[in-house]
A protein has these predicted regions:
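Hydrophobic/aromatic-lined pockets within catalytic cores
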Residues: 53, 132, 166-170
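Activation targets extended, charge/polar-rich intrinsically disordered C-terminal tails
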Residues: 139-191
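A structural motif
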Residues: 98-101, 106, 116-141
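Glycine-rich catalytic cores of cysteine/serine-nucleophile enzymes that process amide/ester linkages
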Residues: 2-112, 141-150
Length: 191
């Protein structure tokens, strides 16, 4: 299982979101970059996903019963997004916009930075199934951008969903960059 941190820039409205989040978290210099930095010491992630791998032993908890990559090389990921529809197989809010969802993603591109997750994979997969369709926390996003808007405890944004799935206390305090830094710190402490 890995943490995938998105460092690319989407086109259209999602790209504007990537840039605004990067402006808030990484500063003006990173705001204007459209290509990922080769220097991974610069944290500039604007989105977080948890990636399930074939060796994780949670095939039975995946939407199609396998952690094997599909024909496009995409692996099952879990996160919360504001601008994607919840898949039809979700137990909660299928077809609705925004929230916790499973999605197959090719994370083996330079748009993603991957870090090992030293956490209980089964607990994360169970959390993912139990929370599919949970609403996206737009208020927390506004709070990151303006510093004054509180989060809604029943809703989660991407890094908050990932941190909560991992069992990290105060998950609402994590943004994509601080979650990536926390995971890298855990990995460094283990080595």
């Amino acid at each position: 299982m890995k943490l995938a941190s998105y460092v690319g820039t989407h086109s259209s409205l999602m790209g504007l979101g990537n840039r605004l989040i990067r402006l808030r978290l990484s500063g003006v210099k990173e705001f204007f970059k459209t290509n990922p930095s080769k220097d991974q010491s610069i944290l500039r992630a604007s989105h977080s996903e948890i990636v399930f791998e074939p060796s994780d032993g949670v095939d039975h908890l995946m939407p199609d019963g396998t952690c094997q990559p599909n024909e496009k090389g995409e692996l099952w990921c879990i996160s919360s997004t504001g601008l994607e529809h919840i898949p039809s197989f979700s137990k909660r809010r299928p077809g609705k916009m925004g929230g916790v969802r499973f999605k197959r993603i090719d994370v083996q591109t330079d748009q993603w930075e991957l870090d090992n997750l030293p956490f209980d994979t089964v607990k994360v997969a169970v959390w993912s199934n139990e929370n599919q369709g949970r609403l996206y926390d737009w208020q927390l996003i506004l709070g990151f951008l303006t510093w004054v808007v509180p989060n809604k405890k029943s809703r989660v944004m991407c890094s908050e969903a990932c941190a909560e799935a991992l069992g990290i206390p105060d998950s609402h305090r994590f943004d994509p960059c601080s979650l990536q830094a926390f995971v890298r710190g855990c990995n460094h402490a283990r080595n």
